[in-house]
Amino acid sequence: MTTLLPALDLAQLDALDARDPLAHKRAEFDLPGDIIYLDGNSLGALPRRVPARLSQVATEEWGHHLIRSWTRNAEAAQDWMALPDRVAAKLAPLLGAGAHEVAVGDSTSVNTFKALAAALRLSGRRVILSDADNFPTDLYVAQGLARLLGDVEVRTAPGDEMTQHFTDDVGVVLLTEVDYRTGRRLDMRAITAAAHARGIVTVWDLAHSAGAFAVDLGGAGADFAIGCGYKFLNGGPGAPAFLYVAERHLDRAEVVLSGWMGHADPFEMARAYAPAPGARRFVVGTPQVLSLSALDAALDVFGDVDLGALREKSLSLTDTFIRLMEPLAEQYPLELVTPLAHAERGSQVSYRHPHAQQVMAQLIECGIVGDFRTPDILRFGFTPLYLSHGDVGRAVAGIAAVLDELEGPA
């Protein structure tokens, strides 16, 4: 049986939690008491305020007021019609964006298509460059757009060599700020500057960034960005995604999926499309009221959160996990693939293990919920709003027990 000699004892973990300025946020989530949830980077936990909001929307707004709810109480910001704009206004500060630069709705994949198409038009070039190991949907969407347009080429390159492939024929670079497998965080500001120096338009995927730490799209000079609402933003399964368009591009970026909800006056029922002001023009169809309402309520959790403290806790949690895992990495075939440098780390920690799928299945069975990514990645997500350092210690103890049971020390 392995003897775990942690770098931090339980008293130290308790002391870290006692000083945690975000400790009170845990009570705002409905978390099962029999698990340690390290998978908020796949699906965020349920904020307690969401069920009541959904019940209100379903029984009162839909059930009682019916179609009147589309415009009812607009002066009090309670109408459905402007719900995407209200959600965008709550989300924008987490992205370092203005509310008018953010559109909320559709899925991440659909928004990626919109962003890539608009970015290509702006660039006047025909090559999309992406990380060879980018999240598959980003690559699939780029490939589909290339097939549709016919004269567009999709190129890929290793992530750590990306800027070396910024050639004069590249029009758009599509990158994910935090790698979904390793948790490695890219330097958005530096890469964007390098892209702009070569006349390249940037599209950033923030799926593993938004809600995990403060994103600064404006400060980084990003052109476009997309992301989902169901991971660190806790908007629930299938939550609407978002699309960011830098203000300098709003009047020039072409809306290739032009729908009536992106029209300047939808109920004019005009025969020709006229774009709405700001990023709202990128909203395509009828707002998904139920899922938008869930995301709207979930974002209220961030209302009193200092984003600097959020990042500090994220790094403290992941530092603690890495230190506590060191004895296990010495005894078992565990390879840390997440960077140690804070500037290069998101809010997850990943290890390679030859039997990662089996190990993760057993961990989940024991109540330690992370996830597996092919071919050999154990992935653990750390959501600062509802995880504690004590959770980290208990998780590592559970991981040690599972590894002992499955294979014994290497």
Swiss-Prot record:
GO molecular function per UniProt: kynureninase activity; pyridoxal phosphate binding
Keyword Hydrolase part of the UniProt annotation: yes
Transmembrane segments: none
Gene Ontology CC: one annotated term: cytoplasm
A GO biological process held by the record: L-kynurenine catabolic process
CC cofactor: pyridoxal 5'-phosphate
Pfam families: KYNU_C
InterPro entries: Kynureninase, PyrdxlP-dep_Trfase, PyrdxlP-dep_Trfase_major, PyrdxlP-dep_Trfase_small
Superkingdom of origin: Bacteria
Record carries keyword Hydrolase: yes
Enzyme Commission code: 3.7.1.3
N6-(pyridoxal phosphate)lysine modified-residue sites: 231
The reaction(s) this protein catalyses: L-kynurenine + H2O = anthranilate + L-alanine + H(+); 3-hydroxy-L-kynurenine + H2O = 3-hydroxyanthranilate + L-alanine + H(+)
Pathway where this protein functions: Amino-acid degradation; L-kynurenine degradation; L-alanine and anthranilate from L-kynurenine: step 1/1; Cofactor biosynthesis; NAD(+) biosynthesis; quinolinate from L-kynurenine: step 2/3
Alphabetic keyword roster: Hydrolase, Pyridine nucleotide biosynthesis, Pyridoxal phosphate
Amino acids binding pyridoxal 5'-phosphate: 108-109, 135-138, 176, 205, 208, 230, 260, 286
Function, as annotated: Catalyzes the cleavage of L-kynurenine (L-Kyn) and L-3-hydroxykynurenine (L-3OHKyn) into anthranilic acid (AA) and 3-hydroxyanthranilic acid (3-OHAA), respectively.
Family: Belongs to the kynureninase family.
Quaternary context: Homodimer.
Entry protein name: Kynureninase
Native organism: Deinococcus radiodurans (strain ATCC 13939 / DSM 20539 / JCM 16871 / CCUG 27074 / LMG 4051 / NBRC 15346 / NCIMB 9279 / VKM B-1422 / R1)
Lineage: Bacteria, Thermotogati, Deinococcota, Deinococci, Deinococcales
Gene name of this polypeptide: kynU
